[in-house]
């Protein structure tokens, strides 16, 4: 990421505030060129940002990075095939250098211990490190994701554009509501994730996701209630000590 003085960053945020979500994507590509990428989880709302990207004249040249932990539900893998065919994306699959079986042999089933430190180790191995490696391999300086401010306490503190681990993180949908997502998908006839009809409002790994139930909804259903963020969207100082060498 090029060095930004605070005035540059604030000016960019002010500009992004006045744009629509698709225009924010176009702005990022215009300013970052080949250094721009998009991340996707092929989750409940993923079709929205992929659809917006596909409608940009240069959209098909933008790398779309998907962190495949090896623990996603079968429905997510099926949905990913559907969306890849629909949008013809330039997909980059980011995976850990250690297989799920090897990780479990060395570290156990980290998501079953009820210890947040073990969850952080799991997320570092299976999510954060693979994403950072993929971004480094593709020279990414700015990446867009579909996070929204209403999802978690941490995300309420986000702005349109923030530095994260030596790159810029763009949030085109930051001010969108679940209703905005739903109506956009209806307007453009976008397919729903199969688990949406089973009560899921968010989905990640099979062992750390569940349908909305009772007072629990959204990100509260993730990670056994121990945490709401996997580390991908956290700043450097929040993950120092968890990251591996060279990340």
Question: Could you say what each language-model-derived stretch is?
Answer:
Residues 1-247:
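Nucleotide-activated chemistry modules centered on ATP-dependent adenylation/adenylyltransferase
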